[in-house]
Amino acid sequence: MKFIIKLFPEITIKSQSVRLRFIKILTGNIRNVLKHYDETLAVVRHWDNIEVRAKDENQRLAIRDALTRIPGIHHILEVEDVPFTDMHDIFEKALVQYRDQLEGKTFCVRVKRRGKHDFSSIDVERYVGGGLNQHIESARVKLTNPEVTVHLEVEDDRLLLIKGRYEGIGGFPIGTQEDVLSLISGGFDSGVSSYMLMRRGCRVHYCFFNLGGAAHEIGVRQVAHYLWNRFGSSHRVRFVAINFEPVVGEILEKIDDGQMGVILKRMMVRAASKVAERYGVQALVTGEALGQVSSQTLTNLRLIDNVSDTLILRPLISYDKEHIINLARQIGTEDFARTMPEYCGVISKSPTVKAAKSKIEAEEEKFDFSILDKVVEEANNVDIREIAQQTEQEVVEVETVNGFGPNDVILDIRSIDEQEDKPLKVEGIDVVSLPFYKLSTKFGDLDQNRTWLLWCERGVMSRLQALYLREQGFNNVKVYRP
């Protein structure tokens, strides 16, 4: 099988040296992602496209899906590459390929040509289109808004029969821009803002301020791992977790109620800036949107920015909540966000929308900054690829099994789409479907006299969810890894 990768248009207008660098980086990113599916595949870069050739036909759908999620790719063409002799040969091959698709449809033919030939692209379009129209009686030519467009590419003595076109996410290849540190809470905003910076070519590391215990951190780890695995797995990134409960406790005890929200955000920026400096990261990323909550007025945002020299990027600053939720739905983080607890909004009963710098600084004089230094020093830094291994260490009390007993039920916790694409069937045991994002609210409705064996393809989500359910008091869960 063969795929032709078309570059994001902004890449093609760069200078020659920059364009070549971007293409080289994108080629490396594609190799890094696809090697998990087929180690023998070939990735070949050209001036205006990248070719991917693979031998394992069983991985065709997985490879195609992975390509649509790599930043820097505008669209993917799945093609059949065959030799041809003349225009009539092109027509005959197109007839075999497209006859079934064109039955009873309106169609047009579009051709791109490279190389030296005694015919033009329009000549091929007319010849092939006329031939298809004659040989498929129920088909009809329609040059504007046809039901089917027959795409052909001619390159020297090769004909590319385009079997399908699939849109990519666009943007710049990860690694073409500098690293950033995303302040991730697991909600709608931070997930979308992280994705937007990945799509713009940044390697996104994650910094999480834990305000709600182990269960909260597990949920945010899931979001970060999902974003990385889906859009940024070509690069290694860090997940830094900071236990911010001591800082919140100090704020609740010593800071005036109205100033708590702004001061909490200032403390987070201070801590994140220290982490960014430690790892040589150039900017912080937040999901703040203008006027969304009390701390996100222009006055308050300016005061928050003032505590650090580190650049703070806010890609969602002009977005409304509906737009953000729609983006979260598109990238797949909506269900995570809906079940994620929100802690920041509850610590202040009457927050100020226009904080005064003098008052904020006066309140912060009451704060013991050694507490902030201590939590940053004790921050837990993990390679995001090791989340599964770390979870295995943390859930030693959760048994992993490769078999089952008479009272066991396998619980498939993959997303609905994954379950529909690849249903799980295991002989001799019942399999129940319950997506991971519904476990927190629906697991208690299941028969608690049964033992539930949580399963997902890679075992990451099942381990994270097993730990979460254990913390909620459910002792009838195990991890199933056949």
UniProtKB/Swiss-Prot annotation:
Disulfide bonds join 344-456. This is tRNA sulfurtransferase. InterPro entries: Rhodanese-like_dom, Rhodanese-like_dom_sf, Rossmann-like_a/b/a_fold, ThiI_AANH, ThiI_fer, ThiI_N, THII_Thiazole_biosynth_dom, THUMP_dom. Keywords: ATP-binding, Cytoplasm, Disulfide bond, Nucleotide-binding, Redox-active center, RNA-binding, Thiamine biosynthesis, Transferase, tRNA-binding. Catalyzes the ATP-dependent transfer of a sulfur to tRNA to produce 4-thiouridine in position 8 of tRNAs, which functions as a near-UV photosensor. Also catalyzes the transfer of sulfur to the sulfur carrier protein ThiS, forming ThiS-thiocarboxylate. This is a step in the synthesis of thiazole, in the thiamine biosynthesis pathway. The sulfur is donated as persulfide by IscS. Its main location: cytoplasm. GO terms for biological process: thiamine biosynthetic process; thiamine diphosphate biosynthetic process; thiazole biosynthetic process; tRNA 4-thiouridine biosynthesis. Belongs to the ThiI family. One of its GO terms (molecular function) is tRNA binding. Its EC number is 2.8.1.4. ATP binds at residues 183-184, 265, 287, 296.
